[in-house]
């Protein structure tokens, strides 16, 4: 049997202003958040995943569809639960204005697709950062997903599941 889904959707629309800074930009991150509160970071979604499973254990999680639209370089996102990094995904690509990256971790359609303004669709799986967990899922309970996408617009859909039948 396939599970029933209830979709929770949230969006962040950010201004497309370019920010010019000085100083060194490091090409690595650490698996923790530097702020006292993860909600202080721009591009953070707080998610309450109320999925129900017949065998409800901590390893179960729900699929997610992430959409990133607009200009950004090497977009990536991280899922935190109780302050700990539990999943991450990212791509080595430069999104231009008019392009949209759609990444789905649904079992039936695990895809990473790039849409351009002319309607062309291409797979960007080969540009996925394979040092990350990839095709993130949201854990049961309260968690946060943090996007590092500069000024691009972001939306996330969490597919709550019910497979108790």
Predicted features and spans:
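Short, charged, solvent-exposed linker or helix-capping segments at domain edges/interfaces
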Residues: 8-19
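Intrinsically disordered, low-complexity segments enriched in serine, threonine, and glycine
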Residues: 17-165
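Oligomerization/assembly interface segments of phage tail-like spikes and tubes
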Residues: 1-9, 143
């Amino acid at each position: 049997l396939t599970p029933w889904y209830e979709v929770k959707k949230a969006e962040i629309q950010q201004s497309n202003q370019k920010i010019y800074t000085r100083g060194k930009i490091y090409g690595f991150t650490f698996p923790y958040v530097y702020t006292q509160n993860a909600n202080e970071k721009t591009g953070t979604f707080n998610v309450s995943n109320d999925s129900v499973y017949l065998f409800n254990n901590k390893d179960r999680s729900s699929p997610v569809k992430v959409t990133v639209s607009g200009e950004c370089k090497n977009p990536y996102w991280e899922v935190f639960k109780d302050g700990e990094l539990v999943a991450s995904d990212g791509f080595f690509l430069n999104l231009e204005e008019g392009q949209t990256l759609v990444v789905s971790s649904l079992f039936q359609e695990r895809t990473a697709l790039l849409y351009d303004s002319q309607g062309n669709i291409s797979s960007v799986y080969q540009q996925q950062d394979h040092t990350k967990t990839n095709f993130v899922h949201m854990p049961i309970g309260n968690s946060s997903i943090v996007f590092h996408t500069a000024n691009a617009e972001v939306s996330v859909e969490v597919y709550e599941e019910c497979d108790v039948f």
